[in-house]
Amino acid sequence: MKKKTTLSEEDQALFRQLMAGTRKIKQDTIVHRPQRKKISEVPVKRLIQEQADASHYFSDEFQPLLNTEGPVKYVRPDVSHFEAKKLRRGDYSPELFLDLHGLTQLQAKQELGALIAACRREHVFCACVMHGHGKHILKQQTPLWLAQHPHVMAFHQAPKEYGGDAALLVLIEVEEWLPPELP
């Protein structure tokens, strides 16, 4: 451990003289986010329940009408179409990534449900879902499942840096977070 260096009396007096007439600045420009809970702090039973609740929305029988021409995209009716444009341009950078490679459809649904629940719990607005190319099963099903979930605001085929046509950028509706009151 290093020794603490102390200032001489002369240096301390000089410092006090230079600082005379100054006042402490009140910090009011940075709003601190609440610390995120680690996933390990959330009870396992709650995680399993959230995952089951979220995957409840994914049906294989219901086929939402999605545009089949061009890149895969979807915007919920109450959300601005500019959000899809922002996703396409890469204005949103995903904070959570989900890789569905090698999963069955059932496992993929459960993982999608867990991702959406985690995004809402952690206040994450944008996530990336990598479905891959493979046999095109997950590539075709993933957009259909996401379009059914009420907390998915929009999704768009990811830009090249996030996986291109083998991935989707997803906007998740999170509960409104208000900054803490400043004293």
Swiss-Prot record:
Regulation: Correct positioning in stalled/collided ribosomes is probably required for activation.
Keywords: Endonuclease, Hydrolase, Nuclease, RNA-binding, rRNA-binding
Mutant lacking the gene: phenotype: Significantly increased readthrough of strong stalling motifs. Hypersensitive to erythromycin (which increases stalling at specific mRNA sites).
PROSITE patterns: SMR
Domain of life, source organism: Bacteria
EC number per UniProt: 3.1.-.-
Annotated region (N-terminal domain, required for ribosome-binding), positions in chain: 1-97
Coiled-coil residue spans: none
GO molecular function: RNA endonuclease activity; rRNA binding
Residues annotated as transmembrane: none
A GO biological-process term: rescue of stalled ribosome
Limits of the Smr domain: 98-173
UniProt comment concerning the protein's domains: Has a probably flexible N-terminal domain and a conserved C-terminal SMR domain; the N-terminal domain is required for ribosome binding via uS2.
HAMAP family: SmrB
Family (UniProt): Belongs to the SmrB family.
Quaternary structure (record): Associates with collided ribosomes, but not with correctly translating polysomes. In stalled/collided ribosomes specifically contacts ribosomal proteins uS2, uS3 and uS5 in the collided ribosome and uS11, bS21 and 16S rRNA helices h26 and h40 in the leading (stalled) ribosome.
Role description: Acts as a ribosome collision sensor. Detects stalled/collided disomes (pairs of ribosomes where the leading ribosome is stalled and a second ribosome has collided with it) and endonucleolytically cleaves mRNA at the 5' boundary of the stalled ribosome. Stalled/collided disomes form a new interface (primarily via the 30S subunits) that binds SmrB. Cleaved mRNA becomes available for tmRNA ligation, leading to ribosomal subunit dissociation and rescue of stalled ribosomes.
Protein name (Swiss-Prot/TrEMBL): Ribosome rescue factor SmrB
Organism: Escherichia coli (strain K12)
Organism taxonomic ancestry: Bacteria, Pseudomonadati, Pseudomonadota, Gammaproteobacteria, Enterobacterales
